[in-house]
Amino acid sequence: DTDRSRGLGDVYKRQAPKLIKGEELNIIIGSRPFRDDEGSELVKLNIMLILNEKYGIVESDFISAELEAVPAFKAKDVGFDRSLVGAYGQDDRVCAYTELMAVLELNNPEKTAVAILTDKEETGSDGNTGLRSSYLRYFIADLASTFGVKGRTVLQNSRCLSADVNAAFDPTFPDVFEKRNSALLNGGVCVTKYTGSRGKSGTSDASAEFAGEIRRLLDANGVIWQTGELGKVDIGGGGTVAAYIANLDVNTIDVGVPVLSMHAPFEITAKTDIWAAYRAFEAFVNN
């Protein structure tokens, strides 16, 4: 993608929601023309040839393809002490990975453990791959039927950690945080009792009993943890998929890694917090 030179135009007069327009998010994919042909779209022809040779893609495939454009750099150590991880998409890969590893490393668990890696969270969780669909309820019902019980009985007796990040306190922008109720880098995995917009709008508010259960579990297993809200109440906020699981009558609470620069192309997390998240999920699925 490109950015306008600082000295050109009236970009500084734009309001924040219009700072970058959707139609301005154009990706640079090449500039070299195809040599052995004549025509007006030689650059396009050359790019299509490369895509075809590498991936077998032809132009009509773009109608049905799902493509993901990501920053062209690998995850990096951040800081002179290399204590941080910098990478794109840590919301929510950093929680998905730690959750998945905790489940994969289980050996003959006493209780059934399920890791749900679901889609469309950032766009509302709609569609048949989002958690607002019925696929999870049907999946649990199918599992329950093999034991001769009802799916709703299994759901009502289940517990869930919604593995999602929280915003770490950023001293560069302290005005959007309530410092006494914000997660800190290197403070451990963050337990978030509720999220929502401007308080608890559109939230899942975990019960006091379940929040206490998780607190005792983490303490008993020596997991470093903290609590935090997603910014000041009147500033905004955010949501997770916890509400959609809780709506199935499952005790659910958000647990995840604090992140600096959430949703930026280069998000930052602390390695100790990532380890604490893994330890938290490990303790949960083993108890």
Question: Which residue stretches match the model-derived regions?
Answer:
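Single conserved hydrophobic/aromatic residue that forms the stacking wall/gate
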Residues: 1-8, 12
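Flexible, glycine/charged-enriched surface loops at secondary-structure junctions
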Residues: 56-66, 109-115, 148-157, 218-232
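Glycine/charged-rich beta-loop-alpha catalytic/anionic-binding loops adjacent to active sites
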Residues: 74-86, 258-261
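Alpha-helical metal-binding/catalytic segments enriched in His/Glu/Asp
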Residues: 86-127, 132-134, 138, 280-282
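A glycine-rich helix N-cap at a beta->alpha junction
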Residues: 134-161
